[in-house]
Curated annotation (Swiss-Prot):
Enzyme class of the recorded protein, top EC level: transferase
GO MF annotation terms: DNA binding; DNA-directed RNA polymerase activity; magnesium ion binding; zinc ion binding
Domain of life: Bacteria
Disulfide bonds: none
Annotated CDD domains: RNAP_beta'_C (cd02655), RNAP_beta'_N (cd01609)
Pfam family, one: RNA_pol_Rpb1_3
Keyword annotations: DNA-directed RNA polymerase, Magnesium, Metal-binding, Nucleotidyltransferase, Transcription, Transferase, Zinc
Biological role stated in the UniProt entry: DNA-dependent RNA polymerase catalyzes the transcription of DNA into RNA using the four ribonucleoside triphosphates as substrates.
Coiled-coil zones: none
Organism from which the protein derives: Neisseria meningitidis serogroup A / serotype 4A (strain DSM 15465 / Z2491)
Residues the entry annotates as binding Zn(2+) 2: 816, 890, 897, 900
Family: Belongs to the RNA polymerase beta' chain family.
Protein name: DNA-directed RNA polymerase subunit beta'
Single Gene Ontology BP annotation: DNA-templated transcription
Amino acid sequence: MNLLNLFNPLQTAGMEEEFDAIKIGIASPETIRSWSYGEVKKPETINYRTFKPERDGLFCAKIFGPVKDYECLCGKYKRLKFKGVTCEKCGVEVTLSKVRRERMGHIELAAPVAHIWFLKSLPSRLGMVLDMTLRDIERVLYFEAFVVTDPGMTPLQRRQLLTEDDYYNKLDEYGDDFDAKMGAEGIRELLRTLNVAGEIEILRQELESTGSDTKIKKIAKRLKVLEAFHRSGMKLEWMIMDVLPVLPPDLRPLVPLDGGRFATSDLNDLYRRVINRNNRLKRLLELHAPDIIVRNEKRMLQEAVDSLLDNGRRGKAMTGANKRPLKSLADMIKGKGGRFRQNLLGKRVDYSGRSVITVGPYLRLHQCGLPKKMALELFKPFIFHKLEKQGLASTVKAAKKLVEQEVPEVWDILEEVIREHPIMLNRAPTLHRLGIQAFEPILIEGKAIQLHPLVCAAFNADFDGDQMAVHVPLSLEAQMEARTLMLASNNVLSPANGEPIIVPSQDIVLGLYYMTRDRINAKGEGSLFADVKEVHRAYHTKQVELGTKITVRLREWVKNEAGEFEPVVNRYETTVGRALLSEILPKGLPFEYVNKALKKKEISKLINASFRLCGLRDTVIFADHLMYTGFGFAAKGGISIAVDDMEIPKEKAALLAEANAEVKEIEDQYRQGLVTNGERYNKVVDIWGRAGDKIAKAMMDNLSKQKVIDRDGNEVDQESFNSIYMMADSGARGSAAQIKQLSGMRGLMAKPDGSIIETPITSNFREGLTVLQYFIATHGARKGLADTALKTANSGYLTRRLVDVTQDLVVVEDDCGTSDGFVMKAVVQGGDVIEALRDRILGRVTASDVVDPSSGETLVEAGTLLTEKLVDMIDQSGVDEVKVRTPITCKTRHGLCAHCYGRDLARGKLVNAGEAVGVIAAQSIGEPGTQLTMRTFHIGGAASRAAAASQVEAKSNGTARFSSQMRYVANNKGELVVIGRSCEVVIHDDIGRERERHKVPYGAILLVQDGMAIKAGQTLATWDPHTRPMITEHAGMVKFENVEEGVTVAKQTDDVTGLSTLVVIDGKRRSSSASKLLRPTVKLLDENGVEICIPGTSTPVSMAFPVGAVITVREGQEIGKGDVLARIPQASSKTRDITGGLPRVAELFEARVPKDAGMLAEITGTVSFGKETKGKQRLIVTDVDGVAYETLISKEKQILVHDGQVVNRGETIVDGAVDPHDILRLQGIEALARYIVQEVQEVYRLQGVKISDKHIEVIIRQMLRRVNIADAGETGFITGEQVERGDVMAANEKALEEGKEPARYENVLLGITKASLSTDSFISAASFQETTRVLTEAAIMGKQDELRGLKENVIVGRLIPAGTGLTYHRSRHQQWQGVEQETAETQVTDE
């Protein structure tokens, strides 16, 4: 389909061309001439006196069409009746002037010119095709050298470069036997004579015969480009242009400004330069000017065309009169202000308005207040229609007048028009889909939009001057969709985690909390009431207070077997407030949900329970009532803040004095030289940190309780009614940390570089700060503000990349039928269950049957959606792990299936076909991005304390189990010594559920055994945190090798104890060169003095001591299994900065290789060390068959294994951050997914943000969508190329059907940016980043965009293939297939 017709406005609606794909390619000179309506010969634009376009110029009316509708230039033919006539005087065709937006011209170039994109867009495509370097091609193109195009019978090589002197010498030598050319002619000649098919054959043979990796890569790249040309039928020489298309003049307008000047598009300037130089060159060629002059002119022409296509890509950018680089064609389409992102993906829309928002506390959830003035403007066409229909106006003009005069009838009509016509409200930035919701408008006076308080959380709106935009859905379908899908009352749950997002906050929470708190000995305590009405009367006649404890008979509604509600009457001990609140409970919600002091969390649970038990409609009504009630009681409660509410604890002075004394003691120790400066600093920071916590605790204990006299006259404690405490406790506003600053002490502050200042601020805000304290505090405050600004931009960019990588992922079918999935367990860290199994599997589909561990019967069959009921049952039966389906293993080719995705979190049932789950996942991960921190944490003070733990204790009763990687030996004392690297002790409860999971380091001593029953608080294992031991797994007599005092080891004597030890010296520091290569090792001998071998092999046991190891055994000493040979001191708090927050999330999704990455074992086998090289150690792993795998590791890295140790494939052998690519390669997709999900979740968890694992898995699916072909088999792929997973699967299926050999492939992990750019859709990739590179590549490949994703369809202006658009696309597809079948059938019948 011709692209020009895609945007052709002259085609009538009936002629709308249907298209299914867009193809991009390189235009041949013939194509360019066929687009053109004439050649532009002159650089002139318009005549400055008559303002008419010059003939044959850049705005020529003859070529591009008339300037005025239906009027030729000289004015001979005017009006519609001459339509289609061409004026014989001025040559202009009489037609609409808007053809000037689409008619193109052309320039015939006097010399061919290379297209800069194919030359300079890296990797250079011209260079690839010709197998020449970019530098060489440039020298030819810009007339610095000749290139041999046809060597003839001479010894010259084709494509050889000759300088000018060389050329003339060779000319003298060989005469006309050879051909050499300069400039684009030379390159074009080379391209024209290149035999593509022959070259492909040669390359394929080379590919099979060569062994070197770099060569294979190089050949594969070249092969790919040549095959693309071969396939698409484009000619190589089209990359060199003979003819240049000229953009239609209305797309590069010339606008007269007042004062006789013109504002012009930069393109006109650029075209003018090209035409000038081209005409000059033509003249020079006619005059047969000297070579050197012609060459210079040709070079200038090449540069002018380069600037027109992509200014600044080569050399200096061309500048206009004001020294600013001119905007070229490439700049028009790329970047944020380019065509893609500015005009195609983000358009401004009519029927919209914006205004400030204020609170509408009396609204219902689905309503919003719309100012009358705004509504009148937005709904104008509807009002005109109604006015005409009711006969109040005869024409549109009359109707317009009525509306402008604002006659009373207009307001009545406006009311009618607006009724049941939803409008959409949007608050920028729209970070997730709840940033746009539909409401029914209520007309209000004033100029501000009124917003329902409960939807503020979704919009992230507050009323400090926020503005919102209003949009009107016009068509009936649009109104329907807005009402059913976007109405605020239909969006109660958050798509990110499936929890209610319509949750009361702030005042409402405070009001409800105040209403449901109980008071001891309040008026009327202990009264009995027959029903709620009686409580009402008592409360209004002031017989009882809100917090009075009473007993009341309540009627509740319970579902019976038939599913109908039956009343049940119960007596409850409760308070007056709670009894009053019970009135608004929906049917079927038990009273116990509100029979407690309602804090924010409880209210959230209440709404969630209401949604699950009573359904959407009742929940919305309930939420509204909660809001009205909450506001009412917040007003009646009159809770406010006074200075007296900030009670400073009496213990503060004593605690400060104690801390000061401790600090003084440390300072004294430092002066005596007992501790280093670093230790002193850490300890001081620690002391103040603890002091701050103690004061805060004292303050909270003091605030949270107050003494009262009960009915019997005794003094008792009750929860405090202190206003500040109530605000924090209810979750309405503020937190313990903030109260600490108000009435405790402010605590430690950080310097701008993130290090902690060791003198804390001991005052609080109530006491006031001194000048110095205030100054210290300003650092942090300012850094916070600067951080926020950066954070917003970074977070937005992350969201954009995430959306781009997942935008084409839509649920397209119900079930792909796979039984693959991942095994889900509870997330346990240290001793705590962070996320229970039930929360992880809720809303997923089982991949295999869930079996009861005790009875062995099937609880849930495979393929079942796990609802709340089912997960509760699984939870109670003690199932430890469940295999569930996941998007990562879904077999659907373009998109996902509903069963692999599971429940639609925002609707609470299985996801519908057409749901754009990719975009939802991206929004859910990106939206909280602004809440994440930006900083990298320096481990100091508190954190290093945690790092130096020396034991683990059980936190609950249960049974100890060792993880599968656990390896240990028993030493002579009978202690179990851990000799594995990734060992864990897991604690199970009585029914076998995992409760805790503790990591146990290498060298720890286990104090429990597998399967042993343990009590809470029991120590499981102990170890020395400051040294890392080296442990023998064999018994025998010690024999040292290369352990020479003063050469490889040094004797160190402890001053205090007088004991001496041997310490291994670093090879670099040793004196003689021979001793540098010596490695001190230990071997073991048996009683006969023979070397002991590793069991089952003939390799002797030999363990090398690492540098810095303190040797703890003596020559000839008898040692047993599990004994310590040496200890390696650990640098106690080596501050490795942890990347946290947003940068960490970005790092994970971009799949970056970490800075000092650790290393995993490539194979299972035995470790040994080879010969060291300079600064590197050689680590060798030998497997059972004796195959060795060796790697070089730099000396600075900490190797976690030692000689003779057995490691499993994928086990960590060198300390450092884990590289996700390694995990994928060595442990597989499931391990990788688990790693990324866990790491991402950890960042969000720290900020208290809940996101469903599902969303992260959707992103991971997209990161894994490409594979590397390891062996192409007989599928036609090229070995080493990256292709879509689905394409390989399809090709392999086909190959197997035909009995051919399928391709073997390896999984590849791509970062989200790379994955976005490597998508099949070039339109999507080009509109994302690196537009030039993407389009160049697509053009050469002759790519076809199937318009599968959402982005591509938005760009070409169609409905997106998601949601209601999916059905439209499907029905169109079926029609197409039907048409194709019909045509096929008719052909058959004709024959």
